[in-house]
């Protein structure tokens, strides 16, 4: 790993209130433990030997903007003691209702140059139904403050397929967001996870999801509208102005290495994928005892064929698809031969197309992407 670039992910698992659809590792009403947790994260960073240059840092959650900005500054300061390139991409996730202009100024001063703001929808009634703590007006205030303090590279998160969401609601949201001219827009379909409050409400009939056809129509409306407005569709759920694609996420999709710090954080190093314990108390205790290994669960030690399959799966998340020559350069094999059976099946079903030196999803394949990815799991 000496000459390979790496990314860093830091997990801040604290929230003001958990959204009704959220299945991520996050905790409310744990404020008393925040300082110990931040100290543990800083210690974990110190204990980790990272030789390779760090090109991207991503601070996610939870709601990282919920905690004091000084904690964020301390974490970034600790990472910067490592081999960080001169101008890394540093992203932090921000939720409206949890930031002030002073917090944003501190983010800028410690090198954060990309914000990801969770809006989800401009419809206040829908925001309430999914358990968001903010309204659209608070989002606008956050966005304007961010621009005022000098943030140019801003992502806005939207969601489609929400309970009781109509195509008109989505059109209105998209129209308002496009007016703001952010550099990046992510649009995710709601995934109903078992055991979440939203799943329980749907089961009881209190909330109704749009049908599959409506949800797909929403997706294609988003894709077409954003492309007409100068956004490049570069990954299933992501759109960017030229040159503003998320470098951190792109590196993950290109199978590059990354170190995860904090409870529940995932890492990919050499041929190993592992994650830290999701239990905050256990995480802190093990870090304080300098037992990094006790926090870790190894999910996979990859053989070459595992890496090849994963390369295909991750590559087919990207709209430009897989460059056959890049695959050959990495694995000294031709993917057309290695995956001849899978590719024939997917081509026959018109889910992928092989064009010149590229393998990519068709429009039908974008709609049925899960079926495509299943072939490489």
Residue ranges and their predicted role:
Residues 333-345:
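Short amphipathic alpha-helical interaction segments
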Residues 364-377:
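Short, amphipathic alpha-helical interaction segments positioned at domain boundaries
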Residues 347-357:
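A short, conserved structural fragment
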Residues 13-26:
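Local cysteine-cluster metal-coordination motifs and their immediate loop/turn environment
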Residues 3-5, 26-48, 55-333:
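C-terminal scaffold of the Radical SAM
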Residues 8-11:
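Short active-site neighborhood of thiol/selenol oxidoreductases, capturing the structured segment around
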Residues 358-362:
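Minor-groove-contacting beta-hairpin "wing" of winged helix-turn-helix DNA-binding domains
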């Amino acid at each position: 790993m000496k000459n390979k670039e790496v990314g860093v992910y830091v997990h801040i698992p604290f929230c003001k209130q958990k959204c009704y659809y959220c299945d991520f590792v996050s905790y409310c009403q744990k404020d008393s433990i925040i300082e110990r947790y931040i100290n543990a994260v800083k210690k974990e960073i110190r204990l980790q030997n990272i030789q390779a240059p760090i090109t991207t840092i991503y601070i996610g959650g939870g709601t990282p903007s919920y905690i004091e900005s000084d904690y964020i500054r301390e974490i970034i300061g600790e990472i910067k003691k490592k081999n960080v390139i001169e101008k890394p991409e540093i992203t932090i996730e921000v939720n409206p209702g949890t930031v002030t202009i002073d917090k944003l100024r501190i983010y800028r001063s410690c090198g954060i140059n990309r914000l990801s703001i969770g809006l989800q929808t401009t419809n206040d009634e829908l925001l309430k139904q999914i358990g968001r703590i903010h309204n659209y007006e608070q989002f606008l205030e956050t966005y304007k403050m961010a621009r005022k303090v000098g943030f140019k590279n801003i992502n806005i998160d939207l969601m489609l397929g929400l309970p009781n969401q109509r195509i008109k609601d989505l059109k209105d949201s998209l129209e308002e967001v496009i007016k703001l001219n952010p550099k990046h827009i992510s649009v995710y379909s709601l995934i109903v996870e078992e055991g979440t409050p939203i799943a329980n409400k749907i089961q009881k009939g209190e909330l109704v999801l749009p049908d599959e056809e409506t949800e797909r129509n929403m997706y294609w409306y988003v894709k077409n509208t954003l492309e007409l407005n100068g956004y490049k569709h570069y990954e299933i759920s992501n759109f960017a102005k030229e040159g503003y694609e998320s470098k951190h996420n792109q590196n993950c999709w290109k199978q590059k290495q990354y170190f995860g710090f904090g409870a529940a954080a995932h890492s990919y190093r050499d041929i190993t994928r592992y994650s830290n314990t999701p239990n905050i108390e256990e995480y802190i205790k093990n870090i304080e005892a300098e037992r990094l290994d006790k926090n870790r669960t190894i999910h996979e030690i990859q053989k070459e064929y595992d890496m090849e399959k994963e390369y295909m799966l991750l590559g087919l998340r990207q709209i430009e698809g897989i460059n056959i020559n890049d695959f050959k350069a990495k694995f000294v094999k031709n993917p057309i031969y290695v995956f001849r059976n899978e590719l024939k099946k997917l081509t026959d079903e018109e889910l992928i197309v092989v064009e010149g030196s590229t393998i990519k999803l068709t429009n039908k394949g974008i709609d049925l992407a899960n079926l495509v990815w299943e072939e490489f799991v």
